[in-house]
Regions:
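Long, low-complexity, intrinsically disordered regions
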Residues: 1-4, 8-10
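Active-site-flanking segments in enzyme catalytic domains
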Residues: 12-49, 54-210
């Protein structure tokens, strides 16, 4: 189960936010919060709606999750659903933290999209990797991710996948799966201005799913 981590003391995101099922205390459908916080909920849901329109199916639900206090995951994809840690269900805090990460190069720019849209797009990238895996018959997301990034690298001038991932973001170098998630977030947020390496990864994804 993968997810983004956060260092709340530093006010920014960092990698290593993977969680286990035992970290999840409860979840609820995010749409249930729309009556009370429509604008922010819609920001979070927009990438999900967009991806569903483009690919047909991405995830069953977008959820808010209550996690154990020692969990630093901001959001995660569990193989069926995408969830946002309710601790980070705060627009201002999310925007401030994400801006710091973009400035440092840890995550790609979110362009004209909001931080919430960028974070959820990242998790959708994991879901799309999973969808490709089902097409390939590969049972593990890391195995699917390796196939995807190796195909994408051939569309670039890079000699290795880490070198390619480094052009996307620092976090993209942590694993092939994170490189894909960062690439989708980059392309979703920046369109034609996204990094060429991100576009190469999405070309491969789209080749399998469209």
């Amino acid at each position: 189960m993968g997810g983004r981590g956060a260092s709340s003391g530093a006010g920014r995101y960092r990698g290593g936010g993977g969680i286990s099922a035992s970290d999840i205390l409860s979840t609820r459908d995010l749409i249930s919060e729309r009556e009370h916080n429509q604008q922010f909920v819609d920001e979070i849901l927009t990438p999900f709606w967009d991806a569903n329109n483009e690919y047909g199916y991405v995830a069953e639900q977008i959820q808010l999750a209550t996690l154990k206090p020692n969990s630093n995951a901001i959001a995660y994809y569990d193989g069926s659903n995408i969830a946002l840690n309710e601790t980070f269900y705060n627009k201002k805090g999310l925007e401030t933290a994400y801006a710091a990460c973009v400035k440092s190069g840890f995550h790609p720019s979110n362009g004209k999209k909001t931080a919430a849209e960028a974070v959820m797009a990242h998790e959708i990238g994991h879901a799309l990797t999973d969808a490709v895996g089902k097409k390939l018959g590969t049972p593990f997301i890391d195995q699917s991710a390796t196939i995807i990034v190796n195909e994408a690298r051939k569309q670039t001038k890079h000699k290795g996948v880490v070198q390619m991932a480094r052009k996307i973001s620092t976090y993209a170098t942590s694993s092939n799966a994170e490189a894909i998630a960062e690439a989708f977030s980059d392309v979703y947020c920046n369109g034609g201005r996204a990094k060429s390496e991100s576009k190469a990864i999405m070309n491969v994804i789209n080749g399998y799913l469209k």
